Design a protein with these regions (language model features):
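Aromatic-rich peripheral "rim/lid" segments of glycoside hydrolase catalytic domains that contact
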Residues: 582-644
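Short alpha-beta junction capping motif
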Residues: 716-756, 835-837, 841
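Active-site-adjacent substrate/metal-binding segments within catalytic domains
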Residues: 57, 62-92, 100-105, 110-116, ...
Length: 868
């Protein structure tokens, strides 16, 4: 027998619900051949809310035998099912539903639903990704037992292609089912249909949609609307009563409520008010409440103004990757945890990348004070998809309605401050412009842009631009890494000058951190990490699995350094709108893009603490602008600055600057001046200096390198030909073997793989591991992992596969390979071949720059000593 246990609850005064969660009968329909008349239900153990994967329905996913592009594409659902699914349940409808408004509410469905009651089709098919599926059953259902039949179809019915985070194997997958609340709702015909709260600097305007039994132009009903507002502390601010006349079955009224002493909502004080509306009409009363925050947002003079105060967005991206469920969490505690984690790293903003999260995510963001940007599941351009925006005519109508639905459903949330139609769209910008113009006119409670990414002429409806280029200028470091390596002064002021709206730097970072294949054991839910398993097998095959932790730490250290520079470039730019990282946490799709400081479970990889990260990504960040590399005959000229977007402005900041040489203080000052000059001529040995700048308790650090005059040992033999190499091997001696003799050379790079070595094919490595205690570095300052003194050296280097050498090889510098290569290569290593003692050096030591000359000096002194 079907499971009929139902739970009843009340919302407000009149609305009741019947909980339809629990066991449903189900039937698969792989070839979409079933109809309501032919379908036969044989199973009664499908649990809702839940997905087919939750219920172990579909083709079981197996691990791949070996690495391949397909194997590392993304983790997969343990059970894959992409087809219609039929669900059925007998529901007991109570007597008090008679004459009432009745709805079936399903909080989130992927991607379409159809409903039959007792075999009769009810309403149209609903295709909706971002908001609840709601069926109006008023007048279509009577008290007693009824059979509800659902058809859920997760096929690509909207021609979305495969990229948008709301519908992609790379992100949340193609799950089939119903998640969140599933319930029957019923209430009097005279009820409040919706409440929208519009805030300004004097109070609120309530848009209330009231329903009634008025269906004739010759009939009206008198109604009373009473509004109460409760403060964030729970104090009742007062009651206002409005008399109105109802002319339609669904009527819109606007009511004004002024608030004299406001507690604004923002990242520091996420104050939430409650508006309670009582609607009395035709002898019936309905009471509904809505939480809201007193906040306004606009852009003006290239600034984003929240509550008339400039804000700066420090964000990360959520791409709908949730490996335990395989679909968005419908539990507010998950969102609270994630947002608190993000905030602990100094960030205040989350962009939902080509998807819209569920209600509980907004609730958590409201509570915690997180600024949210929402997008539709729209990502179409010919660079990555078969379609461009607008090529499918259904998209204009669908996405216009989708934008309205998102605004209606989530628009009251103060955290919801930004809206974009989608990610990296190209094609019909007339369509995007029409949608944005209409939705902005419909709801002015947030700021808007046509699409996230791609430089373009700013439309009148656009409030900001989020892109990696703006006005023809770079606004992320990816394409200006050489300049960033020279100094800590890079900014995007030229872009700000040329673009009329605030600029947000798009998807900053994307630096590949070697994937932690031991995370496989964390995947205890619906998602099978086939990609990590394939990479692990490949590591074992290449005999590098034992180096996993070293690879993660080295590549992660480099990623942290580069993220720091990317972030600080944005912070240095006056009136810059902000940045959005890709990403604080890993992206596991698109060929395994493990680019995060956190893993996909929002847990630390141990690369940097949240407090250390916050030092350069938080609300107030001291900034030190200077060259990175000096000669000891130079003077260090630096500019001191402060990025200041904390709750309270730091007026007349005092800069406490300390420069350390090892444990010794080399220079120290406390000043209100923005410029300092530090002579370096007292430094006699090449060294790394640590710079610590503190302002009002906020601290930030940098490293700079000072090179003293170097001594070159000219009597060291340097071999550049095979003939010379054969000679020394045969006759004996010691020498440096230069890169001209490297067989099958592997080109080096300081900057690691971008995103994924498979998604964007690349042979680049992901960092290096340096034996910094080796005597070869007695006169060259370095730590275990390279800093910017290695940038030009590594970019002009080659390595070779040291596993191919027959004898013992002692790597001094070991390259961290990318996971699709896993070659154990080195640009600097020692070995003995025949009678020769050799140092293989893949660096170009002829460069006319300080760090190159110093490395040459340090290497030649080592080779010419008895230490070699």
């Amino acid at each position: 027998m079907p499971h009929r246990t139902q739970r009843y609850s009340k919302i407000g005064d009149t609305m009741k619900t019947i909980d339809l969660s629990g066991k449903w009968n189900y039937k698969t329909d792989i070839d979409d051949s079933q109809t309501i008349d032919s379908i036969k239900f044989e199973n009664n153990n499908f649990n809702l809310p839940g997905s087919t994967c939750d219920n172990r329905i579909g083709k079981k996913t197996e691990y791949f035998d070996k690495i391949s592009k397909e194997a590392v594409r993304a983790p997969r659902e343990r059970y894959e099912y992409i087809a219609p699914l039929w669900l059925q349940k007998t529901v007991s409808i109570p007597n008090d539903t008679d004459g009432k408004t009745v709805r079936l509410f399903m909080e989130r469905v992927n991607i379409s639903s159809e409903l039959w009651i007792d075999g009769v089709k009810t309403d149209r098919q609903i295709i909706e990704l971002s908001t609840p599926h709601i069926y109006n059953l008023t007048g279509k259902i009577t008290p007693g037992e009824h059979t509800f039949t659902l058809k859920i179809d997760n096929r690509n019915l909207l021609n979305l292609d495969t990229m948008a985070s709301g519908y992609s194997v790379d992100t949340q997958g193609y799950w089939n089912g119903v998640i969140g609340r599933i319930e029957l709702q019923y209430e009097e015909k005279e009820h409040i249909d919706s409440i929208q709260v519009y805030t300004d600097d004097k109070g609120i305007t309530l848009k209330v949609v009231e329903t009634s039994d008025v269906h004739s132009p010759f009939k009206t009903e008198k109604a009373t609307v009473t509004v109460n507002v409760t403060s964030p502390k729970g104090d009742l601010l007062g009651e206002k009563i409005f008399e109105t006349k109802v002319f339609n079955s669904k009527q819109v009224d606007y009511f004004r409520y002024d608030i004299s002493e406001m507690n604004y909502w923002d990242e520091f004080n996420p104050n939430l008010y409650t508006a309670t509306v009582k609607y009395e009409c035709n002898g019936h009363t309905d009471i509904k409440s809505v939480k809201f925050g007193m906040r306004t947002i606009k852009t003006e003079n290239k600034k984003i103004l929240l509550n008339n105060r400039q804000i700066s967005l420090r964000g990360t991206i959520d791409c709908a990757i949730y490996p335990l469920t395989g679909y968005p969490p419908m539990d507010i505690e998950v969102w609270r945890k994630n947002f608190k984690t993000i905030k602990s790293y100094g960030l205040n903003h989350v962009r939902f990348h080509a998807w819209c999260p569920p209600e509980c995510a907004f609730n958590a963001a409201d509570e915690i004070g997180m600024y949210i940007s929402v997008e539709m599941s729209l990502w179409l351009n010919h660079d990555v998809c078969a379609l461009e925006t607008g090529e499918d005519p259904i998209h204009r109508q669908y996405f216009m309605q989708e934008a309205i639905n998102i605004s209606k459903t989530y628009g009251n949330h103060p955290s919801f401050i930004m809206f974009s139609n989608g990610n990296e769209n190209m094609g019909d910008f007339d369509m995007l412009n029409d949608i944005t113009t209409c939705i902005k006119a419909y709801d002015n409670r947030r700021i808007y842009t046509l699409t996230t990414n791609f430089d373009h002429p700013i439309m009148p409806c656009e409030d900001y631009l989020c892109a990696y280029e703006a006005g023809g200028h770079n606004v992320r470091i990816q394409n200006c890494q050489d300049k960033a390596a020279e100094n800590t002064s890079l900014d995007y002021s030229s872009a700000v000058k040329d673009v009329p709206v605030p600029i947000i730097s798009f998807e900053v970072g994307q630096y590949c951190v070697y994937p932690d294949v031991d995370l496989i054991e964390k995947y205890t839910g619906n998602i099978l990490p086939v990609n990590l398993d394939a990479i692990k097998k490949f590591m074992i095959e290449k005999n590098v699995y034992h180096k996993l932790n070293d690879y993660i730490k080295a590549s992660g250290d480099l990623a942290v350094k580069l993220y720091k520079e990317d972030i600080e470039a944005a912070l240095r730019t006056k009136d810059f709108g902000g940045f959005e990282l890709l990403s604080l946490s890993d992206y596991t799709g698109q060929s395994t893009a493990t680019v995060g400081i956190l893993d996909v479970f929002y847990e630390s990889k141990g690369l940097i603490s949240h407090d250390e990260f916050k030092n350069f990504a938080g609300e107030a960040v001291p900034l030190f602008k200077a060259k990175r590399i000096f000669k000891n005959t130079d003077t260090l000229e630096a500019e001191l600055d402060l990025y200041d977007f904390g709750e309270k402005k730091i007026n007349n900041p005092v800069y406490n600057l300390t420069v350390q040489n090892g444990k010794q203080v080399f220079y120290k000052t406390s000043t209100t001046e923005s410029k300092v000059s530090i002579p370096l001529n007292s430094i006699t040995k090449s060294t790394m200096l640590s710079v610590i700048l503190e302002v009002n308790g906020y601290k930030n650090t940098w490293r700079i390198f000072v090179f003293a005059e170097n001594k070159i040992e000219n009597n060291v033999r340097m071999i550049k030909s095979e003939e010379e190499l054969d000679d020394i091997i045969k006759n004996g001696g010691k020498a440096i073997v230069m890169k001209e003799c490297f067989k099958n050379p592997i080109h080096g790079s300081f900057i690691p793989v971008f995103w994924s070595p498979v998604h964007f094919p690349s042979q680049k490595p992901c960092g290096a591991i340096i034996d910094n205690k080796h005597r070869i570095f007695d006169d060259f300052p370095t730590e275990k992992y390279p800093d910017y003194q290695w940038k030009r050296l590594l970019d002009n280097s080659v390595g070779t596969d040291i596993s191919k050498f027959a004898g013992e090889v002692k790597p001094i510098i070991e390259t961290v390979p990318n996971f699709f290569d896993n070659t154990a290569s080195s640009p600097l290593f020692e070995t003995e071949i025949g009678k020769a003692k050799l140092l293989f050096c893949g660096f170009d030591l002829d460069g006319d720059y300080p760090e190159c000359k110093q490395l040459l000096s340090s290497i030649t002194q080592y080779v010419n000593s008895d230490k070699f």
